[in-house]
Amino acid sequence: MKRRRPVHTLAIVFGVVAAVPSIAAADTSFPAAAGDMTARGNLLVWTPWTGPGRLMSGFGDAAPPLPIPRARFGSVDLGTDARGRTVLVYRSCQAARPRHCAVYLYDFASQRHRRLAALDRSGCRVGDVRISRGTVAFARDCGGRALDGLYLKRPGKPVRRMRGVPAVRSFDLDGNTVAFIHSQQRDGPEESTWWLTIEVRVLQLGQRRSRLLARERQLVSPAPSGAYVEDVRLDSRFAYWERQVFTEDFRQEILRRPINGSAPPTQLERAGRLYVDTYADRLGSYAVSGDRMYYSRPAYVTGSEAFIAQVAGTPVFR
């Protein structure tokens, strides 16, 4: 579930303004400024990049808005209800009062939405939210209190806290599997610097020990170095995540690994990707559903084009 990233300022510093490559591979795109993205089957839903707007559904210039009131959307996820039907869960904040937020469920069959009031708790706010088989997983932020963490709301049962999951930066839910990104901080080699160790992990609900899939280290300083990971997704027994590599040429990569750890991580081929740039890659959000993968490029610099693209054919990871 999107997220404003500290690396965006890095892209601005590089001052790169580049058009969509004209010869690069056959990834198809259309102009759109997308924030968060989610996909399931042949459905694609995305939020506005900034400010209040409409939730959009579909790929292409003719993509229509969903019949959901205009708002500021903070998190969206296409999943399934208890009967296996496709539904959309999302966090909506009032356009006029952005601190007044709630989580809603949209039913594509009835084209109706309803508030999930059971997720609310006084003094806390809901962050990212996911749904699978009718179970809602959500992050709860209570201002640094002991109540902070990930929670589950199963159909017909009360909200309960998820065991075995620390404070997370990103997470996803698919059936009984939770993937999450966790980070730990320690002092760096100089004043006003620090190290971040960031891990991608998966956990089976009901268990307390998670499996490590990837680990990166980033030195946070006026000139960041190392690598950072975020935006974990689950699909087809794989965990996906984005890696940001801080070198002279800032790079962004989409990786995946089987959730059982049976093979090492592999990276989405860079050839033909429209977010790849000469000095600094410009990947916004991404979404995956089986053989379909989408990604966005936001407009960091006035005059550059924001778009949503689809990877041509079956995505190749090596």
Mark where each language-model region is:
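Acidic, Pro/Ser/Gly/Ala-rich intrinsically disordered segments
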Residues: K2, S22-I23
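Bacterial N-terminal signal peptides
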Residues: L10-P21
